[in-house]
Regions:
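Juxtamembrane interface at the cytosolic side of transmembrane helices
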Residues: 1, 184-241, 252, 428-456
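Alpha-helical transmembrane signal-anchor/signal-peptide segments
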Residues: 8-32, 251-275
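Repeated scaffold domains used in trafficking and secretory/extracellular systems
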Residues: 30-43, 76-91, 120-132, 271-286, ...
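Loop/turn residues immediately N-terminal
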Residues: 54-58, 64, 93, 99-103, ...
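Short loop/turn segments that connect beta-strands within beta-propeller blades
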Residues: 61-65, 106-110, 146-150, 305-308, ...
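Beta-propeller fold detector
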Residues: 66-74, 112-118, 151-166, 311-320, ...
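Hydrophobic alpha-helical segments
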Residues: 116-206
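Extended, hydrophilic extramembrane loops/domains of integral membrane proteins
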Residues: 134-172, 337, 383-417
């Protein structure tokens, strides 16, 4: 399963149009009360409300009594309608930013793709507006457009003031595990390792099983099987152990060893380039009170007077889960509402005061777990029931969710992620967190003992 799911994850574009109904998945994966990322945010449009999240866009009004599918024009596949943000511009132009592209709503209420000049391996992380300017943030660049929004200028954010170029140790290990650290060639090498591990697994089982079925056939096949199993295993032992160890480090408890680490970029890798913000940008928003831009990255928050200025790290760094921000809105003055899996907080930038949205107390330090009491996946201020945050697990109770939305499809790529990380095995309960740790040790044991047996 690791090998097959890994191959799918290494080539997401090949499988982006393949979905599976949640009907066939464990009940925890079914949507309930807009949970599991179904509702990330809302946007007022004319006299109605547009809801968006990881399964597209939906149309309703401030009462949310009737929910209508509003996804006409998006490419086939849930992966292609994972909406990061939605903006209604002056003049009623509406833009939706999916992970893989920007779309504009035409007069026939159909979403049309807009080419912003984004690289093939880049992903959109946010969309915002400042006056009549449209700003799209990818994970590596900022794209700026003015009316009629047909041409975008690419901005490379300058290196931060007085900060050395460092990259995430976690992301480096992750990309080494997938091969992405060295581009297409690296991914193909890892694909080969996946196929090798698949062969070693199957041949190992057959070597044990065949003699118990038909002794004659088993005896004839076993020498050849044993020979190739040993040859392939010996030649690729270093690579298979590397893939095993790096995967082992990407899940708890080993994850805690690397999750906050920073290292120099690996020479000649994809992160070793002139853009120090490669795969680090998450959002940029204009603060009308302080007259500057608030830049959020995987390294924290920075401020810039102009988008072309040198970013300055803010003196106060609000608590944000390592999974990143899901909510970033201004409320009054220079108050910012920031939501992530660490919780929902209000940050007044001028004073530096941060308070919990629900308890009005200061942020509490949590040891180990990146999850707070409230696992915030979204927020909406547009319904008559009042403003509310959306909990990833519990959802939102203030607006009803149509029953038929519970089994909306999940992309094959996302299922592969859940399978690859062990989260899909919900019958393990809390033990699923340790699944990779235990299985990883088991695989290492098999590789080590196989090497020992081969020497005899």
């Amino acid at each position: 399963m690791f090998c097959v799911s890994g191959l799918i994850l290494n080539h997401p574009s090949l499988f982006s149009k393949i979905d599976v109904s949640r009907r066939w998945l464990p009940s925890a994966y079914r949507y309930n009360n807009w949970n599991n990322g179904l509702l990330r945010g809302t946007e007022k449009w004319r006299a109605q409300v547009l809801l968006y999240g990881n399964n597209g866009v939906w149309l309703t009004d401030s009462t949310a009594k009737h929910i209508t599918d509003f996804n006409k024009g998006f490419p086939q596949g849930v992966d292609n309608r994972n909406i990061r943000g939605l903006i209604s511009m002056p003049g009623n132009a509406v833009f939706a930013a999916s992970t893989y592209g920007l779309y504009r709503l035409d007069p026939q209420l159909t979403w049309q793709y807009v080419d912003i000049g984004m690289a093939e391996n880049d992903k959109i992380s946010d969309i915002t507006t400042c006056g009549d300017s449209l700003i799209v943030t990818s994970r590596s660049y900022i794209f700026l457009a003015l009316p009629p929004y047909t041409s975008f200028k690419t901005l490379v954010v300058k290196p931060a003031y007085n900060e050395p170029h460092r990259v995430s140790l976690f992301r480096t290990v992750w990309w080494l595990h997938s091969g992405q650290l060295f581009g297409l060639l690296g991914r193909l090498v890892v694909d080969g390792v996946a196929l090798i591990l698949l062969f070693l697994s199957i041949s190992g089982v057959l070597y044990w099983f065949l003699p118990h079925i038909r002794k004659g056939a088993g005896k004839r096949l076993m020498p050849h099987l044993f020979l190739w199993h040993n040859k392939v295993g010996r030649l690729t032992l270093g690579l298979t152990i590397l893939i095993c160890v790096t995967g082992w480090l990407l899940r708890p408890p080993a994850l805690l060893l690397i999750v906050y680490g920073k290292i120099p970029p690996v020479p000649f890798s994809t992160v070793d380039n002139d853009n120090v913000w490669y795969d680090k940008l998450r959002s940029v928003r204009y603060d009308a009170t302080l007259n500057d831009w608030l830049l959020y990255t995987s390294d924290g928050f920075y401020s810039l007077r102009q988008l072309t200025d040198i970013p300055q790290r803010t003196a106060v760094q609000p608590p944000v889960s390592v999974m990143g921000l899901n909510v970033q809105q201004t409320t009054q003055g220079d108050f910012w509402l920031l939501g992530s899996f660490s919780g929902l907080y209000v940050w007044q930038r001028s004073s530096g005061i941060i308070s919990d949205y629900y308890t009005f107390q200061g942020p509490q330090k949590t040891e180990g777990s990146p999850l707070g009491t409230h696992i915030v996946a979204g927020y909406s201020p547009h319904f008559i029931g009042g403003k509310f945050g959306v909990d990833y697990n519990k959802g939102a109770l203030l607006i009803p969710m149509p029953r038929e939305m519970a089994i909306l499809p999940m992309s094959l790529r996302q299922i592969a992620i859940e399978l690859h990380t062990g989260r899909l095995y919900t019958f393990l309960g809390s033990g699923s967190v340790l699944y990779i740790f235990i299985i990883g040790l088991g695989i290492l044991w098999c590789l080590w003992t196989g090497k020992k047996i081969m020497k005899k």
